[in-house]
């Protein structure tokens, strides 16, 4: 079994206080192994991006632990510890147009992390790093003097990927990196991410709402609903044997590229009130080897009979 790089234990993230308190994530538990792509899938507002932002330190946590390489990272950190984490953990944002500084050249955008953390000794070394990174993500060296608005959406996302990977990170959080792109460009960006992972030994947390996309790139998938992770399994296991009703409803909504089969398929509608957790409280349980489901004792017995 591969070594755990990231581990989330009993994580809760809330915003506001008192009557205005909103719990965005509750009882989140999962781990990410070195070198794998772990996907977090859910609808808009489910809390998936909130978890990603908490891991990188952009969101505060209310309780629970986030461990990176065995060390707790969501508590107080010294400046040197924080800087080391920023270098090791990078993020690719959803909207490339909004996440890039429109007033800065591509050269400066990609170099900013190198400047901030003194990751080069000479100007020639910096230029060489940037030139190599541009080539790796499929951009030309003459693009360095241009500004973000001069590029297409796919090219802007490649700039965002270059900005993250030039730091030579170990772990990359990809927050819906293709949702703002044209369909024709999405496969190119996904293939680029997979190639960079293979070449550099990267570990990914891939955040998305499209199950057909995560099937292509993921080793394991966690399904999240209203701040609660309801199911975690290896990719093909989850697609072939979904157990939680919410996962079943998500999978039933994935389009089938066959008009006859698409018309014949039955949509599964998820009703949260079908769960009775008043007395019999749920927890994350391993129903099958490496297949975890959020359920109480009555549901566990029901799911096991259906296997």
UniProtKB/Swiss-Prot annotation:
It comes from the Bacteria. Residues 6-251 form the ABC transporter domain. Coiled coil: none annotated. It is a peripheral membrane protein. GO terms for cellular component: plasma membrane. ATP binds at residues 42-49. Its EC number is 7.4.2.6. GO terms for biological process: peptide transport; protein transport; transmembrane transport. SUPFAM superfamilies: P-loop containing nucleoside triphosphate hydrolases. GO terms for molecular function: ATP binding; ATP hydrolysis activity. The complex is composed of two ATP-binding proteins (OppD and OppF), two transmembrane proteins (OppB and OppC) and a solute-binding protein (OppA). Part of the ABC transporter complex OppABCDF involved in the uptake of oligopeptides. Probably responsible for energy coupling to the transport system. PANTHER family: D,D-DIPEPTIDE TRANSPORT ATP-BINDING PROTEIN DDPF-RELATED, TRANSPORT ATP-BINDING PROTEIN. This is Oligopeptide transport ATP-binding protein OppF.
């Amino acid at each position: 079994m591969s070594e755990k790089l990231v581990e989330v234990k009993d994580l809760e993230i809330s915003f506001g206080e008192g009557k205005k308190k909103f719990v965005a994530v509750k009882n989140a538990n999962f781990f990410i192994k070195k070198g794998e792509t772990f996907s977090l899938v859910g609808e808009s507002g489910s809390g998936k991006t909130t978890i990603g932002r908490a891991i990188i330190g952009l969101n505060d946590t209310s309780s629970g632990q986030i461990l990176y390489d065995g060390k707790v990272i969501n508590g107080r950190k010294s400046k040197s510890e924080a800087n080391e984490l920023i270098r090791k953990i990078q993020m690719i944002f959803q909207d490339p147009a909004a996440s890039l500084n429109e007033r800065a050249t591509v050269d400066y955008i990609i170099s900013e992390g190198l400047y901030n953390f003194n990751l080069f000794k000479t100007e020639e070394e910096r230029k060489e790093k940037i030139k190599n990174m541009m080539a790796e993500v499929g951009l030309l060296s003459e693009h360095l003097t241009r500004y973000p608005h001069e590029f297409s959406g796919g090219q802007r996302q490649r700039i965002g990927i270059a900005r993250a990977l030039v730091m030579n990170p170990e772990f990359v959080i990809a927050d819906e990196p293709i949702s703002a792109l044209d369909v024709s460009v999405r496969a190119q960006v996904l293939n680029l991410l997979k190639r960079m992972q293979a070449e550099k030994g990267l570990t990914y947390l891939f955040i998305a709402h499209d199950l057909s996309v995560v099937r292509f790139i993921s080793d394991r998938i966690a399904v999240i609903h209203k701040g609660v992770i309801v199911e975690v399994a290896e990719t093909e296991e989850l697609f072939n044997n979904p157990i939680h009703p919410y996962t079943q409803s998500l999978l039933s909504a994935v389009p089938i590229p066959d008009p006859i089969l698409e018309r014949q398929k039955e949509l599964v509608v998820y009703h949260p009130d079908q769960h009775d957790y008043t007395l019999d409280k749920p927890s994350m349980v391993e129903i099958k080897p490496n297949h975890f489901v959020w359920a109480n004792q009555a549901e566990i017995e029901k799911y096991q009979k259906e296997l």
